[in-house]
Amino acid sequence: MSSDAPTGPSAPARPHGAIGMVRTASRRVVSVEPFFMEFIAGAEEVLAVHDLSVLLAVVADEDAERRTYARWAESRLVDAVMVVNVREDDDRPAFLADHGIPSVMVGRWDGEPSLPSVRADDVAAMVEAAGYLLELGHRTIAHVTGPGAYLHTQARVRALAAACAPYGIEPVTVEGDYSDDAGERITRELLARSPRPTAIVYDNDVMAVAGLHVAHELGVAVPGEVSLLGWDDSRLCRLTQPPLSTMSLDVHEMGRLVGAAVLETIEGRPAVQDSVVTARLIVRGSTGAPAGT
């Protein structure tokens, strides 16, 4: 893991077989979140065959992310960049193009420049999650999201609201940051509300596991008094008691698809412009019908 690239006269004169990826997050969040480690493993499974590896930088904010890209361009350290957590009005693709670095988007991308993208179908996944909870009888539903600037967060929020609207329900939405701290804090706040949610959807498994711990601490029965639904289906889901229901996304395969798109891009071959990975509902022990139904 790196936060800086070498510069100056000792920098390599040409790319050295690295594919860059920058995470704008605290190192604590990165250290506990399984998603990107599984994603990188999938990408490297494809890239390693071609003597390429992933160079990961963890930075504090968007300005630091741009400075990292600029250093990588100056030192010719990377062949291409995988752009993650696509944002509204995202200027990173244009910035990378201006610096001569090819890129592949991990998330929906309809902007300029036109680039290959690999994304999860967040709308279909949330519609399935919401439909399952509504069919069980839940009518007070909360959603603990990732950062609100991310397009996939916005897509999930809109999809949940649209699914609940025919029932006259307005879900409670609280923004988190994918960390266990956020999962604990927000779950504590939600379980103190009146009326209390009977179901909580989390945008990743780390926050869901943290929420389950809070429910146990407060003596709130899962799923008897509150149902908890995670997202991604990391190994964490099967290690809890009860095991977590979740929206299962094949993150490893998503990484493989991105790795393939990167190879096509740097080799000058046409890349698939929009590859889609679909999550599916996995029901385990943390969800059930609300009490009294």
Regions found by a protein language model. Give the residues of each.
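Amphipathic helical "hinge" segments at domain boundaries
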Residues: 2-68
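Glycine-rich phosphate/diphosphate-binding loops that line cofactor/substrate pockets in enzymes
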Residues: 14-16, 130-141
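Short acidic/polar active-site loop segments enriched in Thr and Asp
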Residues: 17, 79, 139-140, 196-198
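Hinge/beta->alpha junction and helix N-cap segments in small-molecule ligand-binding domains
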Residues: 25-38, 56-65, 118-128, 144-188, ...
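Short, well-structured alpha-helical segments in soluble
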Residues: 65-77, 184-194
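Flexible loop/hinge segments that line or gate small-molecule binding clefts
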Residues: 84-128, 206, 232-244
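Flexible loop/turn connectors
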Residues: 171, 193-293
